[in-house]
């Protein structure tokens, strides 16, 4: 809750002097502190501030989905509310979109995170880049810019929010990145670590497997049918042999 007022102040400082018209959509993912009251206060302070409140914690993918559905703009920016992402980067993200890209991810420079987060995160990003073939360095950066077509077409659930660049690329959208500033966490603590890393790799395999066969379902089920059919023939042959031997 401590970061919410400074965050909206930084957003206003970064955007009020630009030609952009904008709104801010906060998604409260079932917070148990005083965030809900602060968000209601912020909502009352400006007509361009919207608030979505979940009754319990549904996770980041659900929060993104709700925020995307509520947003009215042609360009959507996502960022975490812990003040590690810098709203001053928004104009640069939008400028990169205007070069012809559909999704632009931030690439955090000089990260201010403990080794328990940066080491698994770097490993995760390296593996994801190699497996997906997408040449970006920071898939899990919360600071991203999207054309609204991307947020409308890419469906996420579970933990798939970290793979939005991969999913967008599979849909034919152009993905890029720019370096962004990263600030030290002032409030709260990180929950990222090796446990989430392992789960993330399982999700990556799911994304790539489905992406490979999404347009060719018969290739998947045809091959699966051949394997199962072959196993069935072997089992039936074994049973028939036993029956003949025992009479």
Regions found by a protein language model. Name each.
Residues 1-15:
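Short, well-formed alpha-helical segments that are part of the catalytic scaffolds
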Residues 15-20, 43-48:
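Short helix-capping segments at alpha-helix termini
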Residues 28-37, 83-84:
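A conserved acidic beta->alpha catalytic loop
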